């Protein structure tokens, strides 16, 4: 009795209610195998019945690649396994074309189910669906504006690196992911929300952290059965943090949008062509008076673009630190290509060794083991007779990119020149570009649902690499490369990793190029 009095006197009612709800949810989880009569452990080692759901998810989170290999060793075409998002049908690479059939395999529904879009604060379409549909055309429009955007992005990269890495000519440690994240956020924000907001510290923090916070919230919610998720998300701290951050973003976006609208007032039907492109203004013009949520539209663009670009930039920088012999050839390429006209969209396209380095890094370290996910709206029979029931969530892993000698000789070996050599072969030249998706490289997806932002991501990373390579020397800390990490399907480098950098002296043609950066 005394302990109960102490608990109720020191804990607020809302906290006690949360604890009670948590206890009920935990009970539901432990009882879930009894209630459903379904075991989710399919390819996993056998687990005890009491926590089979939690254990199988734990196996997936820690050993996803090994489990997929195990599954394909038993069933080379397709098999079922459990993930932290529920059961999935895993298909082999030979079914890639079949998954491009929208009549049978739906992308939007897979995304909706994976990222819980029906929950308030998880990009819910409560004001209509325009802000969700607008992302792809907005990114396409932004891609068409890369020619005038690149010089502006280059100036932003210079400012960002000076802030994050300083001009210190002595070697000093820098945290890799946060500093590159800050630079990527500035470049992306310039194109997303325009020059007036792209240096706002609060907005930049949202830009970098929103996706991470959202992923954390989804992972926490996945602990609970789906029928409880619409209730528990209201009280779970990661979900509450996400909703608070969306409101914080709204307080920045709406005044910026009001300013954009004022620029178009006084009878101006079209936007000033001399004002830099921003998806914020473009979205509003595209909406043409239709109801939409401009904040959610921007956060959707952030969610699908920023974190993957930061992840890719980090991995490329790590590879350069691991292979310092690549740095001088890359510097020479930049000087040769950019020597006449400076850093432009056209010159970025001609940085072929850099392009090959990026594509090879992505081949071995994509953002995910499985970038292609679909949901079936009807029963489907594949070419080899495999039956995919209606309502199945389907995944196609990328592992063939580093585990198939018939596609890539020495497939487990990093070779920065691999795709540069492919350009010399007429049969493979068209597959060599970093932005090209194909049957042998699916890191950006495949078919008409290939990532539309890959061109912008490519230019962003190349701009940053040009500035880094010409302005800084790089070293690993204590000779140790940042560790490769896995969590479920996610593949990333240690987010706490640091490297050593110093500002280098530049002379001759390099100095001339930098003057135009």
UniProtKB/Swiss-Prot annotation:
Subcellular location: Membrane
Keywords, comma-separated and alphabetical: Glycoprotein, Heme, Iron, Membrane, Metal-binding, Monooxygenase, Oxidoreductase, Transmembrane, Transmembrane helix
InterPro entries xref list: Cyt_P450, Cyt_P450_CS, Cyt_P450_E_grp-IV, Cyt_P450_sf
Glycosylation sites: 404
Co-factor requirement: heme
Major subcellular site: membrane
Superkingdom in the source lineage: Eukaryota
Pfam families: p450 (PF00067)
EC assignment: 1.-.-.-
Residues passing through the membrane, by range: 15-35
Annotated catalysed reactions: 3-hydroxypentacecilide A + NADPH + O2 + H(+) = chrodrimanin F + NADP(+) + H2O; chrodrimanin C + NADPH + O2 + H(+) = chrodrimanin H + NADP(+) + H2O; verruculide A + NADPH + O2 + H(+) = chrodrimanin E + NADP(+) + H2O; chrodrimanin T + NADPH + O2 + H(+) = chrodrimanin A + NADP(+) + H2O
Biotechnology remark: Compounds in the chrodrimanin family such as chrodrimanin A or verruculide A exhibit strong inhibitory activities against protein tyrosine phosphatase 1B (PTP1B) and therefore, they could potentially be developed into drugs for the treatment of type 2 diabetes or obesity. Furthermore, chrodrimanin B, the end product of the pathway involving chrodrimanin A or verruculide A, does not exhibit the PTP1B inhibitory activity, while it functions as a potent blocker of insect GABA-gated chloride channels.
Membrane topology qualifier: Single-pass membrane protein
Enzyme class: oxidoreductase
GO cellular component, one term: membrane
Protein name: Cytochrome P450 monooxygenase cdmJ
Native source species: Talaromyces verruculosus
